[in-house]
Swiss-Prot record:
Keywords, comma-separated and alphabetical: Ribonucleoprotein, Ribosomal protein, RNA-binding, rRNA-binding
Keyword RNA-binding in record: yes
InterPro entries: Ribosomal_uS19 (IPR002222), Ribosomal_uS19_bac-type (IPR005732), Ribosomal_uS19_CS (IPR020934), Ribosomal_uS19_SF (IPR023575)
Record's protein name: Small ribosomal subunit protein uS19
Family matches, as PANTHER family: RIBOSOMAL PROTEIN S19P FAMILY MEMBER, SMALL RIBOSOMAL SUBUNIT PROTEIN US19M
One GO BP annotation of this record: ribosomal small subunit assembly
Gene Ontology annotations for the cellular component aspect, listed alphabetically: cytoplasm; small ribosomal subunit
Length: 92
């Protein structure tokens, strides 16, 4: 179920402050965040966020195509190593 239009997009307040500070100073540091639920805003374009995936911070460079999506969509939380190979086929 999507968010109501009248409510507007959700972004953590501290994340907006950090993004504005990074834009005004022109620094290209990674902005670490645990807020996977925050919506990507147009003023985030060009910034790099370190989005936490439960294990580490995954660097995500924001592009114009990402605006309106959530930060957590770009930092997968699950690792799938693949299915086990058939041992009989390996021997031959």
């Amino acid at each position: 179920m999507t968010r109501s239009v009248w409510k507007g997009p959700f972004v953590d307040g501290y994340l907006l402050k950090k993004a504005e500070a990074a834009q005004s100073s022109g620094r290209k540091d990674v902005i670490k965040t645990w807020s996977r639920r925050s919506t990507i805003m147009p003023q985030f374009v060009g910034l790099t966020f370190g989005v936490h995936n439960g294990h580490k911070h995954v660097p995500v460079l924001i592009s114009e195509d990402m605006v309106g999506m959530k930060l957590g969509e770009f930092a997968p939380t699950r690792f799938f190593p693949g299915h086990a190979a058939d041992k009989k086929a390996k021997r031959k």
